[in-house]
Amino acid sequence: CDRPPTSPALAGGSTNSLTLGTTGLPAVPFSFAESPRYIRSMTSHAQDATAQSVIQFWFDESSPKQWFTKDAAFDAAIQTRFGKLLDQAALGEFWGWRSDALGRLAEIIVLDQFSRNVWRDTPKSFAQDPMSLVLTQELIALGLDQGLTESQRAFAYMPLMHSESRVVQGESLRQFTALGNSNNLDFAKRHEAIIARFGRYPHRNAILGRDNTAEESAFLQTPGSSF
């Protein structure tokens, strides 16, 4: 659920369809149409300039290939440009961003996505998930997600998919169903199935110092057990 392998299709250019990696799982979890409406940010801007810089970096300056593959250079770029910002966001210092939908989305991206780049393969990469989840739930409750583009909404809902709660996974399925992208919904269903079976993501166990059950150990040997 964190960073799947490189998509052959995206490595050669943009794509509007899901491709399968060597594990048999989608190499890039989300499908984004080539239309700028799905890749570019909204014409409106976040009121806070720093929040807007996050939106611009993620949706205008970065690509799906960078979003969903392990890329040391991309991780380093985020660390250099936004590392201090991530530390501040983790302390809850950017409540002022929540005055508009894009500002709220920027805070979610910093906590839910940048954390996975900057703190990759460490427990800290998941430490901000509860805060990200609450921000997503609040965004939905206020109806502010409805004013975002499809790709923006997909990232707004990612904390639901990252959750190890069966209840929250149900909400993830509802939101990705409403979003109307069958490929994205399929990926959400794959996440939900793992949580329904294990109550957690087994591929996180080693990073978080959790012991595998015998069933989890067997599962981790199968294709598609990790995201």
Please state what every model-predicted region is.
Residues 6-7, 15-18:
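Ser/Thr/Pro/Gly-rich low-complexity, intrinsically disordered segments
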Residues 12-13, 21-24:
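Residue-identity detector for glycine
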Residues 30-32, 38:
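Aromatic (phenylalanine/tyrosine) cluster motif
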